[in-house]
Amino acid sequence: MPFGRNAVIRLEHGGVNESTQHYETVTYWYGLPAASLVRTDELSIGDAASERSHQYVSPGASPPYEIASRYEWGPDTLQGKEIYPAASDRGRTTRTASEFTLKIDPKNWGVMLRRKLDYAFPNQRAEVWVGAAQPPGRSREPQWKPAGVWYLAGSNTCVFSSPRDELGAALQVVETSGRRFRDDEFLIPRELTAGRSAIRIRVKFVPVEIPLYPGYPLPDLAWSEMRYTAYSYVMPRFKLR
């Protein structure tokens, strides 16, 4: 579990965190007194200035849209009190490809790319390609190298199959939660990032045409992008006393 100066760990007691019984937990941390993963850049999709400074290009992308939602953290309300209020954010969807440039540490040992997304679009899959960053205004195509496939299964919609009788026919009940925000991460190997102060990233959408269950209409498929954050793996720097 990578983290910076601190980590917030939430434990849910009971189905909706309603249990008031005594509970204790102990956490052990094994690490070094210096960071080995540092944030080096962030692209906010839907923000014109951020898209421009990161040379964001996505010809088939939707216009920016705003949603008010939550992460999968816990109950919205408990005993009439709102625990996790909804927040608003902007993003786009694409059914083609997106390209952008992110700064990284030249002495990196690899890069972790984190994406904030709209989880209402199921089974998001894309090919990831990495190339050398180009100066602004230069249109030469990078020499792309494959970094792998980025896949996030599922969505905020699920199906419960509860037959009325023990041997009865399946009864599909489809439910959609209000948690549309989600973070997902993709690791870029060092051979594609070492010695570079910035990288050009290409994400090409590959649809997964699988219905929620046989006979259910195929949902709207797209690659969602709200924010891309680059974290560089670095050698920890510290002095022994």
Go through each PLM region and give its residues.
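Beta-strand-rich ligand-recognition modules
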Residues: 1, 81-112, 116-240
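Charged, alpha-helix-forming regions
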Residues: 1-54
